[in-house]
Amino acid sequence: MPELPEVETALRGISPYLKNFTIEKVVVRQPKLRWAVSEELITLKNVKIVDLTRRAKYLIIHTEKGYIIGHLGMSGSVRIVPQNSAIDKHDHIDIVMNNGKLLRYNDPRRFGAWLWTENLDDFHLFLKLGPEPLSDEFNAEYLFKKSRQKSTALKTFLMDNAVVVGVGNIYANESLFICGIHPLKLAKNLTLNQCFSLVNTIKDVLRKAIIQGGTTLKDFLQPDGRPGYFAQELLVYGNKDKPCPKCGGKIESLIIGQRNSFFCPKCQKRG
């Protein structure tokens, strides 16, 4: 599933081809995604794009009339292609621009979404989101306060979008390993010092992943068709039974909150 670094990579890749250009039309070949494609988007024509931003794992395309909200789901990707490009099997949406290019959305599993709103402030999917992990609002004091009374496995806690958005499974695994904290540690047992370490590490891991263009394990591609190269930097994620890069012991895995978790039992003591 594309997480924050992958969505940020997508945003940076598509922005130069969309910002300050005009949408001529939107071609929807498959409207049945996680939620039906908004009717306002299907009928959108001759509207200028004034900005592109991101909130959590949502792409936000700002137009003169409102906002296109895109979510890549489990297997979605966006790319910029010439208007005469051949259509692949899972190319569900084209946003056709007045510069000879189009934004093409491909999604084999169709768990993504393309919606429309005229007001971001009360957009229903944004109302309960936590702070951005790279913002000043996400700090040790915030994490410490938020974790009190939470009898939840720490990795599950870090992946809760009401706590902090966009960390995701890969980056939670990597951050906990670097900090030497077991993924099953209860969130309420975090010390303030551990919160300082976790916050700084999460920010560092996410920034490095963005620089590398995200992580490609299966479906994700950057808008120019290249994979994300952070997969080559992964220390524990997907490395079950391989030697720990710190101690040489064997990396183990378990299921936490229905997600694969990878850790070193020697370097990440439970407690």
Swiss-Prot record:
DNA binds at H90, R109, K150. It catalyses: Hydrolysis of DNA containing ring-opened 7-methylguanine residues, releasing 2,6-diamino-4-hydroxy-5-(N-methyl)formamidopyrimidine; 2'-deoxyribonucleotide-(2'-deoxyribose 5'-phosphate)-2'-deoxyribonucleotide-DNA = a 3'-end 2'-deoxyribonucleotide-(2,3-dehydro-2,3-deoxyribose 5'-phosphate)-DNA + a 5'-end 5'-phospho-2'-deoxyribonucleoside-DNA + H(+). This is Formamidopyrimidine-DNA glycosylase. GO terms for biological process: base-excision repair. Its EC number is 3.2.2.23, 4.2.99.18. CDD domains: EcFpg-like_N (cd08966). The active site is at P2, E3, K57, R259. InterPro entries: DNA_glyclase/AP_lyase_DNA-bd, DNA_glyclase_Znf_dom_DNA_BS, Formamido-pyr_DNA_Glyclase, FPG_cat, MutM-like_N-ter, Ribosomal_uS13-like_H2TH, Znf_DNA_glyclase/AP_lyase, Znf_FPG/IleRS. It comes from the Bacteria. Belongs to the FPG family. Its cofactor is Zn(2+). A zinc finger (FPG-type) spans 235-269. Monomer. Involved in base excision repair of DNA damaged by oxidation or by mutagenic agents. Acts as a DNA glycosylase that recognizes and removes damaged bases. Has a preference for oxidized purines, such as 7,8-dihydro-8-oxoguanine (8-oxoG). Has AP (apurinic/apyrimidinic) lyase activity and introduces nicks in the DNA strand. Cleaves the DNA backbone by beta-delta elimination to generate a single-strand break at the site of the removed base with both 3'- and 5'-phosphates. HAMAP family: Fapy_DNA_glycosyl.
